[in-house]
Design a protein with these regions (language model features):
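Nucleotidyltransferase catalytic core that binds NTPs
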Residues: 2-229
């Protein structure tokens, strides 16, 4: 009888959740976000922006026009987990440079990831979707990123959180869609003629936007900058 009582007590006790559950339960700080409103289609454009260049701006303007986006948020990341961060310019200076280059009333340059303490795109997007559930977010990436998208942390999870717009780049467009992620997500590809519907679609959904053929690359610009030192 006594033993049963102990057993029932143990069964009813609220044991601590597993470690993974703790991670899910972390409450992020109440950050001040760029302008947004329920129903507003907003693009999310992440990168190190070291340095920012004209193709970044052109890609956002193309996506804004073709997808009917009200705003685009540039998420300047502290560092790319897939790239060597040695020699990376300080975050503050990259944010300043990005704001100077963007120079558009509907492009908001932020360091949200640094404020949130998130390292991966999945974590950042998940926070924003939960924080602003009625905003129609769209993730914007260059075609070169689609080629390596399968290497991103929880990349399939990202596709289930928001629609994705892939913007053409000179060169990568020839093979990006044939990569691992492009093939895996072929069933969810939206015709380019239906671009305006992308923000309203339930993910997974993605589109390839042709029209931008810029050879500019932050990696190449960094290499050129290093040679000049």
């Amino acid at each position: 009888m006594w033993g049963r009582g102990l057993l029932l007590t143990d069964m009813n006790r609220e044991f601590p959740p597993p470690r993974a559950a703790y991670a899910e339960a972390i409450v992020k700080p109440r950050l001040v976000l760029p302008p947004n409103a329920p129903g507003m289609p907003i693009g999310l454009f992440g990168g190190t922006f070291d340095p920012p260049h004209a193709a970044h701006r052109a890609a956002c303007l193309l996506a804004m026009r073709r997808l009917g986006l009200d705003r685009v948020w540039w998420l300047v990341t502290p560092g790319n987990p897939l790239k060597d961060t040695k020699g990376l310019a300080p975050l503050a200076s990259r944010v300043v440079a990005a704001r100077k280059l963007a120079h558009h009333p509907r492009i908001d340059v932020t360091d949200l990831e640094a404020q949130l303490g998130t390292r991966y795109t999945y974590e950042t997007v998940k926070y924003l979707v939960r924080r602003c559930p009625q905003v129609r977010f769209v993730w914007i990436m260059g075609a070169d990123n689609l080629r390596s998208f399968h290497r991103w942390q929880r990349w399939r999870g990202i596709t289930k959180l928001v629609p994705i717009a892939v913007v053409d780049r000179l060169g990568p467009s020839l093979y990006a869609s044939a990569g691992v992620a492009g093939q895996a997500l072929a069933y969810a590809r939206v015709p380019e003629t239906a671009a305006k519907t992308l923000p309203e679609r339930t993910p997974p959904a993605w589109i390839y936007l042709h029209g931008l053929k810029s050879p500019l690359s932050s990696t190449a610009l960094r290499a050129a900058r290093a040679l000049q030192r």
